[in-house]
């Protein structure tokens, strides 16, 4: 209420912001919603991160809201193709969480933390992980311009290499090694996309 009141007073004081007050309030509500979602992910009486909804939250907040929100903030509109990039990044970020959850299946079940990986079990969680990887690669392939073939190759090789190591060893040590490897792959991917846009 206090933030809304301050924004309203600011909009009244500066006439050029008057038309944008609805947009400002929308951003404030989005930020408050994101903060509440971050808090209730592992806190509160029924944390949704431990009920199997964490992957969906990561897809939504790190993919759709992160990418589309940034585009709208800078451009003032949403490009239809941006949904593919947002979904691709959301899937890759969900893969990071899934790796962590696959590694922790036994301890999560003992602590009654029923993540999606814990609910699925390791073999099905690996299959789910593979589907996310392949769908993300298809989204990147469809989204990237034809002249950016090196990015398609990078994403394809990174995905296949990652899945090879996921299935090559069945120890938790492998999952522990794959977590930072895939996190750095996602970071490198975002850096390459940024360089492409500069």
Residues covered by each model-derived region:
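Hydrophobic alpha-helical transmembrane segments in multi-pass integral membrane proteins
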Residues: 65-77, 138, 186-198
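Interhelical loop and helix-boundary elements at the membrane-water interface
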Residues: 1, 37-62, 105-130, 163-195
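Functional transmembrane core segments of multi-pass inner-membrane proteins
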Residues: 57-105, 123-126
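Multi-pass membrane catalytic core of lipid/isoprenoid biosynthesis enzymes
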Residues: 1-22, 114-148
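Hydrophobic alpha-helical transmembrane segments of polytopic
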Residues: 2, 27-34, 85, 129-132, ...
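Transmembrane alpha-helical segments that form the membrane-embedded catalytic/substrate-channel core
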Residues: 32-45, 64, 68-69, 87-102, ...
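Intramembrane alpha-helical segments
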Residues: 1-77
